[in-house]
């Protein structure tokens, strides 16, 4: 009898190897899905945590000392630190009236 003919050519181990590969592929796909879900979950948590952190930081900054606010304002705007003090707020009313007077003078000059 020829060894290549009949049922003797198929062994159980060959089929078992294919089944093992199939199971390993399924386990790999399941693991990839789990890792993807975990990564998405972490990203969602970070997206929620960053605004919460920013809000608490801004609340703490707003309740902090005015010197710290002045330093930050001078750094952001490029204004010298001495010009960011409370005298600036006190002069706001004067500057506002000066601007209003200037506008009124322009209107008077335009009509005369």
Swiss-Prot record:
Residues 101-112 have a biased composition (Polar residues). GO terms for biological process: transport of virus in host, cell to cell. Residues 84-98 have a biased composition (Basic and acidic residues). Keywords: Host cell membrane, Host membrane, Membrane, Transmembrane, Transmembrane helix, Transport, Viral movement protein. Residues 77-112 are annotated as: Disordered. The keyword Ubl conjugation does not apply. The keyword Transmembrane applies. The chain crosses the membrane at residues 27-47. Disulfide bonds: none annotated. It is a single-pass membrane protein. Its main location: host cell. It is found in: Host cell membrane. One of its GO terms (cellular component) is host cell plasma membrane. Belongs to the nanovirus movement protein family. May transport viral genome to neighboring plant cells directly through plasmosdesmata, without any budding. The movement protein allows efficient cell to cell propagation, by bypassing the host cell wall barrier. This is Putative movement protein. The lineage of its organism: Viruses, Monodnaviria, Shotokuvirae, Cressdnaviricota, Arfiviricetes.
């Amino acid at each position: 009898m020829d060894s290549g003919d009949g049922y003797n050519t198929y062994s159980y181990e060959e089929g078992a190897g294919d089944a093992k590969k199939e199971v390993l592929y399924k386990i790999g796909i399941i693991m990839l899905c789990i890792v993807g879900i975990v990564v998405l979950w972490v990203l969602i948590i970070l997206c929620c945590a960053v605004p919460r952190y920013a809000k608490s930081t801004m609340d703490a900054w707003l309740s902090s000392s005015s010197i710290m606010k002045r330093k930050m304002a001078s750094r952001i705007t490029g204004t010298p630190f001495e010009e960011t003090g409370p005298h600036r707020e006190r002069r706001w009313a004067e500057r506002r009236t000066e601007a209003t007077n200037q506008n009124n003078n322009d209107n008077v000059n335009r009509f005369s």
